[in-house]
Amino acid sequence: MVTLYGYKRVLKDDLPTSDWKKQLWKDGIGAIDEHLNGFQQWGLPPSDNPYVWPASRHAWALNEVQRFFIEETRLGIPTDFTNEGIRGVESYIATNFPTQLGLGHTWNRNLVHKVGYITGREGRLLGYTNVYAPILDVGRDQRWGRYEEVYGESPYLVAELGIEMAKGMQTDHQVAATSKHYIAYSNNKGGREGMARVDPQMSPREVEMIHVYPWKRVIKEAGILGVMSSYNDYDGFPIQSSYYWLTTRLRGEFGFRGYVVSDSDAVEYLFSKHGTAADMKESVLQSVLAGLNIRCTFRSPDSYVLPLRELIAEGAIPMSTIDDRVRDILRVKFLVGLFDHPYQIDLKETDKEVNCAENQQVALQASKESLVLLKNQDAVLPLDVNKISKIAVCGPNADEEAYALTHYGPLAVEVTTVLEGIRNKVKPGTNVFFTKGCDLVDANWPESELIRYPLTAEEQSEIDKAVENAKKSDVTVVVLGGSNRTCGENKSRSSLDLPGRQLDLLQAVVATGKPVVLILINGRPLSINWADKYVPAILEAWYPGSQGGTAIADALFGDYNPGGKLTVTFPKTVGQIPFNFPTKPNAQVDGGRNKGLDGNMSRVNGPLYPFGYGLSYTTFEYSDISIQPAIVTQVQPVTVRCKVTNTGKRAGDEVVQLYVRDILSSVTTYEKNLVGFDRIHLNPGETKELTFTIEPRDLQLLNSDNHWVVEPGDFKVMVGASSEDIRLNDRFTVVEYGKEQAVTSATSQQQKSVIASSSQESVPLVLDGNLSTAWKANKGEYITFALENNASPNSIAIAWKEKSKDAKFEIQLSGGGGQFLTVYEGTVEATNELKNYRFKGTTASDIRIVITSGNASISEVKIKELKN
């Protein structure tokens, strides 16, 4: 029930020794974390870790450790080797992907699935059976240090990509995917870490709508086998000791069947930081009773095992509870095959496949698809390699590798920097002038974010060198942003501006009058207002992985057309925070329209770049939206179709985004909710039709009784290139199923099989054989006819008496359960005589006529399969 941190973390030995048999923890180890992965011994290679590489030697060493637990312990239960893996498995060398924020900006489910598969496959080949990914935190505060680890701000997008990552990782149960950090972890007060990440700022409804949503879906749809409990409290109750969150919700409501591992030292934090337990023993008691299976810590496992034994002996923790906790762990170990195949046998395959060329191609694709073009004034990009004889490159991230080798992924792979990528791309004989220009941060940082210090002579000299290079070049590429110095765990910021002297460098280079392209390599959105106004071209690369330099150079010179879209919001200033997507109506604007001395505007409004935004070297046109059915019940999906055409001269990718809004609701809902997306590739002139399905869950709200419901009414559908660039829109209507009033006044038994949404007293008139009487209906209203058993209708005869000019209708069939499928759409023709409408027949229990536009009246209906 404990984790033992591996070599040079807590464990002192690389391979088993005779001393291991004397250790208290030998019979209680659930997992060994990060063993021999090289995290504590960065270097080329680490001198004191002979088992870090090659891959086969590493796998052999983990086999030997596993052999000890199987052959030398009382029960012979294999251990679960765990490791990090949000941008590739954290080994000395493995396939290196962009960080998770970059992967989010691909909007590519299939690609993320491949990343997950490679991460899990390489993890298992190296000997690991449990990988800590994906991250299901939802980005809400751009200052937060771990923003680089989220997929984005939309809970729907986090869920969709999290599902694919987890499914890929757990292919054939090659590893267990352990998601983190459960729950309400990513909205700390002020964006601060606070070590225990205490006091998240959100309402209960927001927790459910934003933060619980991805977990619920990923657990149900991907079946993740691991969950890491988070440090933080919510509403004063630490998640680590919460039976409500770890058992009632996680296991009871969501159906989680794996095991829960604590974040490192989270158990200790109950008494050392939260103050909700008196000591370690009480912390252990609270955690185990709440639902914790395995405790993770940077200390010896004895500190947990000893108080746990005391609590069991005292009867404070029943053996039935221990059995439950151990059963979960064993279930996961059985599922990943540890009892059948505990050793990695094919060591030659390990060397052949880990970080192989095929996997690196997937990583390069991910690096390319994560790029977002933020600005391209006058089509500065792409650069023409044939017209450039001199190019200047500067900036602290131009020749930097560290952003590709941060924690939670591969540690020592070869990295292609932006400078190297450019040098590899330009034609022979092209002069590439490089100078760094400035450091990532200055000597007074982070205080320099509050107080402006004058440039030192040395700083001015470095900027002057960059200016001289720019003056003699055709174009200058400035590579700025952040690194693990400014972003990462415990690296929250008080500003979103470019740190250090980076803006000074950029302004000086732009002042030369030569063309400038800004490349951003960073782990969070930045407030680059000056750059947006004065720099002609800006490309956001996030942390693009070890092949980021190649991907960026391909985009700069037109061998690749960037097509990523923002999954986050770029505020104009830190003073706007919280500023994110989705948002409630008018929640992110202030009053006042007139600027200046005589105006009434007191605050800057709007984002610098909104959620979903991103440019391309080509253009796209949207057309032909259709919604089917236009009238649905609360349990019925809606199909939305549209067409997108590449109207430019280059092939390119477009991320088509589907949003929905509940127009009238019992509680305030979000202005737009992302409910669908698709990344498509189009050649010049090519058109593709896209099909989206809006599921009932996408329309749900948490009502005043804290029940998830789909409320009847109109919903607005929006299809666009971003959350603020809506190209197409339409509506559909949800009607309440089961509330129709059955007709009881009819004179025939047949008429009792008819129900309607309105004008119940007139319903019998459609079956009375009299064309002078009619049932009248407006848009959204319908009449439903029950059919005889095993009916398979393919036609219905309708006599329309009156109609408005815009009257349209649908014929729908249902197999039961309230879901109806549209089989015919048409325009009402008021001839007052029966007209036969034919459609493709299928087995159905009910047939429905729905008025989808305007109003109309029906005088008679004939259905040969009508139930008697």
What would you call each of these model-derived segments?
Residues 737-793, 799-805, 829, 833, ...:
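Disordered, acidic Ser/Thr/Pro-rich linker "stalks" and the adjacent N-terminal cap
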Residues 726-738:
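Short beta-strand elements
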Residues 645-651, 788-790, 801-803, 854:
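Short solvent-exposed strand-capping/beta-turn motif centered on an Asx-Ser/Thr pair
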Residues 803-867:
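Trp- and acidic/polar-enriched beta-sheet ligand-binding modules for extracellular glycan
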